[in-house]
Swiss-Prot record:
InterPro entries: Isochorismatase-like_dom (IPR000868), Isochorismatase-like_hydrls (IPR050272), Isochorismatase-like_sf (IPR036380), RutB (IPR019916)
Catalytically driven reaction(s): (Z)-3-ureidoacrylate + H2O + H(+) = (Z)-3-aminoacrylate + NH4(+) + CO2; (Z)-3-ureidoacrylate + H2O = (Z)-3-aminoacrylate + carbamate + H(+); (Z)-2-methylureidoacrylate + H2O + H(+) = (Z)-2-methylaminoacrylate + NH4(+) + CO2
Species this protein is from: Escherichia coli (strain 55989 / EAEC)
Signal peptide stretch: none
Protein name (database record): Ureidoacrylate amidohydrolase RutB
């Protein structure tokens, strides 16, 4: 067992029965020329987030945590995105951007596209699990819940983009399914102004989970920390 210093209080978990979840670290969300950038969102400060996720993934893997990578998007025809009868059709900024700029049709969040791919710096390894997801929440229409329950995993540590959209949505759904969710705040990035990041983290630490950071997480997983706890 390890104890992680977090807000609003420390949380204790078994790394080997926990998962680190990397949410949507795709070119779409973290690279200039990707969907968020083309839709008018600022992605200029995502590079430190990528580096921090690399650090967190390395520490988590060494401690025996399961690593789960999400990729948000749909088939090339966007059938999975839903038609006019779906609220996703009306609220997805990727779909709205393509309707406004038809030349982008088939390029944003389409499986197999550059936009859909994970950023070059983040590469899943054997033993990791990579899951596509068609909506903001990683629990919707994916096998995430069964994957976690079959392994006895109850604690989820979240990283990725966007804090206020897919990260928060997945953590909230996990909360309703009795999972303990922790966000590493410096391994996440918001879609929108800085207040969106602050609001998401406030919601999480106040109502749905815990908030920590990468350095604290790595220190908690270090062999020295395990020795102190033992």
């Amino acid at each position: 067992m390890t104890t992680l210093t977090a807000r609003p209080e420390a949380i204790t978990f078994d790394p080997q029965q926990s998962a680190l979840i990397v949410v949507d670290m795709q070119n779409a969300y973290a690279t200039p020329g990707g969907y968020l950038d083309l839709a008018g969102f600022d992605v200029s400060t995502t590079r430190p987030v990528i580096a921090n996720i690399q650090t967190a993934v390395t520490a988590a893997r060494a401690a025996g945590m399961l690593i789960i990578w999400f990729q948000n998007g749909w088939d090339e025809q966007y059938v999975e995105a839903g038609g006019p009868g779906s609220p996703n059709f009306h609220k997805s900024n990727a779909l709205k951007t393509m309707r406004k700029q038809p030349q982008l049709q088939g390029k944003l969040l389409a499986k197999g596209s550059w936009d859909y791919q994970l950023v070059d710096e983040l590469v899943p390894q054997p033993g990791d699990i990579v899951l596509p997801k068609p909506r903001y929440s990683g629990f919707f229409n994916t096998p995430l819940d069964s994957i976690l329950r079959s392994r006895g995993i109850r604690h989820l540590v979240f990283t990725g983009i966007a804090t206020n959209v897919c990260v928060e949505s997945t953590l909230r759904d996990g909360f309703f399914l009795e999972y303990f969710g922790v966000v590493l705040e410096d391994a996440t990035h918001q879609a929108g102004p800085e207040f969106a990041q602050k609001a998401a983290l406030f919601n999480i630490e106040t109502f749905f989970g815990w908030v920590s950071d990468v350095e604290t997480f790595c220190d908690a997983l270090s062999p020295t920390s395990f020795a102190r706890i033992a």
